[in-house]
């Protein structure tokens, strides 16, 4: 096989031929070393997304991200509650609020996130408004985790080489393969992940990627496309434990929760979403507080169950609905 090059890889993707793990790693190194042009990066992201990713292609991309990540001394005994973004609904920051609730339940949380590339407001924008500093050093981030049992990894600090592709992602303004990478490339690789995926074909792919890396957790997607475990529609859930993936179907009714409409979960800019979070945590009642509260509680429960599965694989008994209700 000839050595990788952009013309070879792009021609291959346009012909809907899969890359090898080696080829996708080569492309990611070119990007992270600053050797790819914006045209090459944009063409690569669009062509790969259009073809549809494979487990090996994602693995090659994530391999290189982790090789270049800034290391952190926290250990990995924790859960990351995270979504790929890209559902384009503009809801409040469910996974960020759920992470705080999970930590309040004494489950350690190592949350990895960035600014929104294709949506309205990402986790970091809201957390910044709430007074969370994004420029902390790795040592300071680790100290916060030691003290509070929860910390936030701002992706640009821990994946500095991703700065080369960030402007292109923003210019494109649509979900790409790179939406999948952040949740998989948490620099400490926590033992558990509760991962929401908006893309229908991407959700089982992400479960297979966790399986490939020997990680545990829950991957979920709402039938309406939300990257959350949702009360707005039924959900598909992939439970990953000990190298196995088990598929479940879950609805609000199964869990004793009221169904709602996406319009009841819509957020705004970072300030508006931060205001929702502070009101929710202070027990204030506000417009749509009940459906938002239910969503936050449900996704926090997903984080607790994911962590339980990682700590005690025998708990992955198939009774997912019972565990989420508990």
Regions found by a protein language model. Give the residues of each.
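A glycine-rich phosphate/pyrophosphate-binding beta-strand-loop-alpha-helix module
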Residues: 45, 92-148
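Residue-level signature of catalytic and energy-coupling elements of molecular machines
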Residues: 44, 86, 127, 182
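Short beta-strand segments at enzyme active-site cores
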Residues: 40-41, 109-112, 219-220
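Glycine-rich anion-binding loops and their surrounding alpha/beta cores
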Residues: 2-5, 12, 18-19, 63, ...
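N-terminal glycine-rich anion-binding loops that anchor highly charged ligand groups
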Residues: 2-4, 11-57, 66-74, 295, ...
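Active-site cofactor/substrate anionic-group-binding motifs, chiefly glycine-
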Residues: 52-113
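Acidic, glycine-rich active-site loops and adjacent beta-strand->loop/helix elements
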Residues: 83-88, 113-119, 158, 223-224
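N-terminal small/glycine-rich loop or linker at the start of catalytic domains
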Residues: 2-15, 79-84, 110
């Amino acid at each position: 096989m000839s050595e990788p090059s952009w013309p070879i890889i792009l021609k291959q993707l346009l012909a809907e031929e899969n890359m090898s793990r080696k080829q996708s790693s080569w492309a990611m190194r070119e990007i992270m070393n600053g050797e790819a042009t914006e045209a090459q990066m944009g063409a690569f992201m669009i062509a790969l997304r259009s073809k549809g990713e494979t487990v090996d292609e994602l693995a090659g991309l994530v391999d290189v991200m982790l090789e270049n990540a800034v290391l952190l001394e926290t250990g990995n005994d924790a859960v990351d509650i995270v979504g790929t973004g890209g559902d384009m609904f503009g809801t409040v920051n469910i996974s960020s609020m759920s992470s705080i609730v999970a930590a309040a339940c004494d489950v350690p949380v190592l949350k990895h996130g960035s600014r929104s590339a294709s949506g309205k407001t990402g986790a970091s924008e809201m957390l910044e408004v709430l007074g969370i500093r994004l420029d902390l050093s790795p040592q300071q981030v680790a100290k916060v985790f030691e003290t509070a049992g929860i910390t936030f990894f701002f992706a640009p600090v821990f994946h500095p080489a991703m700065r080369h592709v960030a402007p292109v992602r923003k210019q494109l303004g649509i979900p790409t393969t790179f939406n999948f990478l952040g949740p998989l490339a948490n620099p400490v690789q926590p033992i558990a992940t509760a991962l929401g995926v908006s893309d229908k074909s991407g959700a089982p792919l992400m479960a297979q990627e966790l399986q490939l890396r020997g990680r545990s957790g829950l991957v979920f997607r709402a039938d309406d496309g939300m990257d959350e475990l949702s009360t707005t529609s039924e959900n598909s859930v992939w439970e990953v434990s000990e190298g196995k993936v088990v598929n479940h179907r879950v609805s609000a009714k199964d869990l004793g929760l009221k169904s709602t409409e996406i319009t009841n979960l819509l957020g705004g800019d970072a300030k508006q979403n931060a205001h929702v979070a502070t009101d929710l945590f202070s027990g204030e009642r506000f417009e749509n507080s009940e459906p938002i509260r239910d969503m936050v509680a449900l996704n926090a429960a997903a984080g607790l169950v994911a962590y339980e599965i990682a700590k005690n694989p025998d708990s992955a008994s198939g009774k997912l609905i019972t565990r989420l209700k508990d």
